[in-house]
């Protein structure tokens, strides 16, 4: 036992002993094992959610990050004093820290977005006022192609902390019309026509069932509310097609959409007419 202790306490150089070297080797071996376990589990979890090149890049950053942290932790055991280096690089470290803060935040947010998958490529979304199609979800940013054909790059930190509206996440989406008809028109007939048009459209869903009803009596019209469900991918086309068909079919059946109307009554005009009649009688 005494010989073993002497061997462990044997100084190789300076104050560094054999025991210190063994500690360094064990720590680095454990760090390597931990890094491999973490990256392996992440690869299994994200292999179907990320592009292969992006996934491999992220795993390498994590792997070598763990190794570097472990290596820095064992440097004092090798007799290396980092205090001078830290002081000399303090200002540089602060500058790099501020510069890399947003990069790290975007990287972490990107990992969470890819894991949670609130959006995917091809989805129609609205993120912080930017509406369009998701073109790509990268590690640091998300690319949106707007309806005008513009490409907008949004940092993942902003995407992750913003309210995300995904228009196609649900299989079906509802839209609504308010159709006004004249008071002289038959509201029941108008409802029957609208229901028939909806039933004839191949993409107007039967379940949930469309709803057509008189909602209120307006100043110039009887207002009929029409609520229809359609597949999210066909929602816009169905909405535009049915709106035009409802208009044309109602007009064919003599049911018109009235213009706003106002009845204006002038008290002075009535008084002037009465006075004019009296003057003519006296003459």
Swiss-Prot record:
InterPro entries: LSM_dom_sf, MS_channel_1st, MS_channel_C, MscS_archaea/bacteria_type, MscS_beta-dom_sf, MscS_channel_2nd, MscS_channel_C_sf, MscS_channel_CS. It is a multi-pass membrane protein. Pfam families: MS_channel_1st, MS_channel_2nd, MS_channel_3rd. It is found in: Cell membrane. The keyword Cytoplasm does not apply. Gene3D superfamilies: 1.10.287.1260, 2.30.30.60, 3.30.70.100. The keyword Cell wall biogenesis/degradation does not apply. PROSITE patterns: UPF0003. GO terms for molecular function: mechanosensitive monoatomic ion channel activity. Keywords: Cell membrane, Membrane, Transmembrane, Transmembrane helix. SUPFAM superfamilies: Mechanosensitive channel protein MscS (YggB), C-terminal domain, Mechanosensitive channel protein MscS (YggB), transmembrane region, Sm-like ribonucleoproteins. The chain crosses the membrane at residues 18-38, 61-81, 94-114. GO terms for cellular component: plasma membrane. Belongs to the MscS (TC 1.A.23) family. This is Uncharacterized MscS family protein AF_1546. It comes from Archaeoglobus fulgidus (strain ATCC 49558 / DSM 4304 / JCM 9628 / NBRC 100126 / VC-16).
């Amino acid at each position: 036992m005494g010989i073993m202790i002497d061997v462990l306490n044997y100084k190789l150089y300076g104050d560094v002993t054999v025991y210190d070297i063994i500690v360094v080797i064990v720590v680095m071996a454990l760090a390597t094992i931990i890094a491999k376990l973490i990256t392996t589990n992440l690869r299994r979890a994200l292999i179907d959610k990320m592009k292969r090149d992006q996934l491999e890049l992220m795993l390498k950053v994590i792997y070598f990050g763990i190794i570097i942290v472990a290596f820095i932790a064992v440097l004092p055991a090798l007799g290396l004093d980092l205090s001078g280096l830290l002081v000399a690089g303090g200002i540089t470290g602060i500058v790099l820290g501020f510069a890399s803060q947003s990069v790290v935040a975007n990287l972490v947010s990107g990992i969470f977005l890819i894991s949670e998958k609130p959006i995917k490529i091809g989805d129609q979304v609205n993120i912080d006022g930017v509406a369009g199609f998701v073109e790509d979800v990268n590690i640091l940013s998300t690319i949106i192609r707007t309806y005008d054909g513009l490409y907008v790059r949004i940092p993942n930190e902003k995407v992750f902390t913003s309210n995300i509206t995904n228009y196609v996440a649900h299989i079906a989406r509802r839209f609504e019309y308010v159709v006004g008809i004249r008071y002289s028109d038959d509201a029941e007939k108008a409802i029957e026509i609208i229901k028939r048009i909806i039933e004839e459209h191949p993409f107007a869903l039967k379940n949930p069932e469309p709803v057509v009803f008189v909602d209120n009596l307006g100043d110039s019209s009887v207002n009929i509310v029409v609520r229809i469900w359609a597949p999210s991918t066909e929602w816009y086309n169905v909405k535009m097609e049915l709106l035009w068909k409802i208009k044309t079919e109602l007009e064919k059946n003599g049911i018109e959409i009235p213009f706003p109307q106002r009845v204006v009554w002038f008290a002075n005009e009535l008084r002037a007419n009465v006075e004019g009649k009296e003057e003519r009688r006296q003459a």
